[in-house]
Swiss-Prot record:
Signal peptide residue numbers: none
Main localization category: cytoplasm
Organism: Mesorhizobium japonicum (strain LMG 29417 / CECT 9101 / MAFF 303099) (Mesorhizobium loti (strain MAFF 303099))
Full protein name: Gamma-glutamyl phosphate reductase
Keywords noted in UniProt: Amino-acid biosynthesis, Cytoplasm, NADP, Oxidoreductase, Proline biosynthesis
EC number of this enzyme: 1.2.1.41
Amino acid sequence: MLKLHEKSGDDTVALMADIGRRARAAARPLAIAPTAAKNAALLAMADAIVARQQDILDANAIDVSNGEEAGLSASFMDRLKLTPARIRAMADGIREIAELKDPVGDVIAAWERPNGLRIERVRTPLGVVGVIYESRPNVTADAGALCLKAGNPVILRGGSDSLNSSAAIHACLVEGLKAAGLPEDAIQLVPTTDRAAVGEMLKGLGGALDVIIPRGGKSLVGRVQSEARVPVFAHLEGICHLYIDRSADLDMAVKIAVNAKMRRTGVCGAAETLLVDRAVASTHLVPILDALRAAGCEIHADQEVLKVFFDAKPATDADWVTEYLDAIIAVKLVDGIGGAIEHIETFSSHHTEAIIAEDPKAVERFFNEIDSAILLHNASTQFADGGEFGMGAEIGIATGKMHARGPVGVEQLTSFKYRVRGSGQVRP
């Protein structure tokens, strides 16, 4: 089990520098590790998580108790809490990653030049990855497994609220590395709650870190983006929109709206704003809102909606830019697909948006004009998930445009290099 480092200041600086050196030392052997060894490690990790389920639950109980005493929100506690089912899902996710094709060494493209040079673009590991996250202990397993499959050492800095849970999961990951003969330093968990550790990671650990992936709230991601001296895959808040077009099937719209908001309110793919075409307000609006209220959702509505649906609170300007992560949704009437696109492009965090429609022209316009990482048609926003995309798992949903966008899975954790084969050519 991870030994907690309780000192701070210069001790934290030295601790993080050592973690960085060890991760960098693990980079080369991991980059050339055979697929069979990586898969063996992953399967051993999954087995260890199942075998140590009670240890993980006991550690999580400590975190949950501390969170309750601290008065953390219900949505935060939902993200923090582990159950036997969630632990099994964690293990299953690692097994799915083991079954994925190894991207390292994959030839993306190949061509021959007129002078006979044969050129290949080949996938390679990114290098040492730093993941900074908050309350979700399952990120420890997902990030560790994904980075391993892609041949990247990873330094995990979880939230202090979930440190006991993350440490118990990390012990299982190390057990898997040992079983496969891979470097134990390939997956390291920062063993301190000292916030200075994050600052050291943002500085790059003396050149040890190649990329940082933040997974958390707006303040965390904002700090990482403003202070990081290494590239960042930004996972911004999920201000996700669900638009009900005039051509939408009502039964489908009701079912998807309830699922998109209420299946799990604390996930980044939960719908936070419902937009309804004014043309079907008289037929679609109230049935959808009735279903949401029956499911326990609080409605924050614009003035037009309040005229026909009374069991709601008036929406303010802040509602359109709020990631509730709770059983609350903002609702607005818009002038058709054009009004929906205008609202989304104004207020979206460019994470995930969905349209419910039978009109193919409306769908194509939605897909073509909205610049978000994930767009869905006639499906819940809660499918915005690497596992649901067949990636086994994800580290996060990248909302930027550089390198990775959307679910960050194994393939997105690679870069590439060029291999050029000649037969004695010299440049004239």
